[in-house]
Amino acid sequence: MHKRKVIVDTNALLIPGTFGIDIYEELEDMGYLEIIIPESVMEELNALRNSESEKGRTKRAAQIGYQLVLQHLQLANGRSRVVIERKGGDTDRDRDTDSEIIRMAKMQDAAVLTSDAELRRRLHQEGLSTVFLRGRNRLVAD
């Protein structure tokens, strides 16, 4: 059976702490059984939660998002599997996280969960599926 995969962008990991939505449960309910978090996304999330300049809601949402990733990595009892994907053989240090996400989505035939309008536009240009927050209370796929 083909596992439906979804790659998660940094801003999507802020959804639980900002809107109180369990993205893992929502993704499972949508049939995504493999949730992939790029290493570069974890680095961005870690930088947000440890940033001296980041204050308030964003920093708190980043801390919640980071803890939930760690919690779901350790929980193997759900229907879905959460993995952190290491950077591939690409040695281009200038490759940005969005380009890395697009490359991974193409290679793994995966959808992408993001709230970034520009990334969604680029994904659609490549013919890739996206999942996004609609109405501040649910995830939808297009």
Where are these regions (language model features)?
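Metal-dependent nucleic-acid phosphoesterase active-site entry motif
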Residues: 1-24, 37
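Short, conserved loop/helix-junction motifs that constitute active-site signature segments
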Residues: 27-31
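Nuclease catalytic cores that cleave nucleic-acid phosphodiester bonds
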Residues: 4, 41-142
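RNA substrate-binding interface of SAM-dependent RNA methyltransferases
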Residues: 35, 40-41
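Glycine-rich, phosphate-binding/catalytic loops in enzymes
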Residues: 23-26, 129-131
